[in-house]
């Protein structure tokens, strides 16, 4: 522990002519959970797209465990141990649960912690195991989210990016998802959690970064934000 799992430094990103990220920097420590907060359109999901290579930055650098990955294709960044649970789940709805998981399988890197495979995913999410032969599109929203998380874990990542994992879920299912995140963190996985619900993030985060209009406007240990209510209200409209 103690090294940096993921570092974004001075990232500028554009959608066409629209400048959407302005010198964004964030640092995820190994085995830690970084909460990335901001209002709609603040740049949270864009930061995740840049990290996994879906949107190449025009300026700045990205490193995974000290290895530069700036400008690499998504496959190359995934090979370094980065996996994304995307907003909206984006499972393969015409495939079975098992097929969704199998297509994402990747051998774990040397020195990894948990070795994720079908049996360990089914142990983590028993309902997914019970429905392994079921077409994924017929699952409930909560089950689809579990499948999306399981699919990301099948790549045996060292860094897991989770973009709005509670979106559209009932409170009981949100509690299950958060319990899963705690378990993964407890196993030493390095996690970036993007959430619309800041109170969920503060339940599990070690560190916080707040974006506003594509810029980092606040950052620090999560515990420090307990006394920064005015700042949270200004940037997030809460507390």
Language-model segments: which ranges?
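ABC-type ATPase nucleotide-binding domains, specifically the catalytic core motifs of the NBD
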Residues: 16, 72, 97-116, 124-129, ...
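The feature captures the beta-strand-to-loop junction immediately N-terminal to the Walker
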Residues: 37-39
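Helix-to-loop junction immediately C-terminal to a conserved catalytic motif
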Residues: 52
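Conserved ABC transporter NBD signature motif
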Residues: 60-69, 80, 114-118
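ABC ATPase C-loop
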Residues: 152-153
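Catalytic Walker B motif of ABC-type/P-loop ATPase nucleotide-binding domains
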Residues: 160-164
């Amino acid at each position: 522990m103690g090294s940096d799992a993921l570092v974004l430094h001075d990232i500028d990103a554009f959608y066409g002519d629209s400048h959407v990220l302005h010198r964004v920097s964030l640092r995820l420590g190994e085995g830690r959970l970084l909460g990335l907060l901001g209002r709609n359109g603040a740049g949270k999901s864009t930061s995740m797209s840049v990290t996994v290579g879906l949107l190449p930055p025009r300026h700045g650098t990205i490193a995974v465990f000290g290895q530069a990955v700036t400008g690499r294709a998504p496959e190359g960044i995934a090979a370094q141990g980065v996996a994304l649970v995307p907003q909206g789940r984006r499972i393969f709805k015409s495939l079975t649960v098992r097929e969704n998981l199998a297509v994402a399988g990747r051998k774990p890197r040397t020195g990894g912690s948990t070795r994720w495979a079908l049996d360990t995913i089914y142990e983590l999410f028993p309902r997914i195991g019970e429905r392994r032969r079921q077409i994924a599109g017929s699952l409930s929203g909560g089950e689809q989210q579990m499948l999306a998380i399981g699919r990301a874990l099948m790549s045996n990542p060292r860094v897991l990016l989770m973009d709005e994992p509670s979106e559209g879920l009932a409170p009981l299912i949100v509690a299950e998802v958060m319990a899963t995140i705690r378990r993964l963190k407890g196993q030493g996985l390095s996690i970036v959690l993007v959430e619309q619900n800041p109170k969920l993030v503060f339940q599990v985060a070690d560190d916080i970064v707040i974006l506003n209009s594509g810029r980092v406007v606040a950052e620090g240990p999560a515990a420090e934000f307990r006394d920064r209510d005015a700042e949270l209200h200004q940037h997030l409209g809460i507390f």
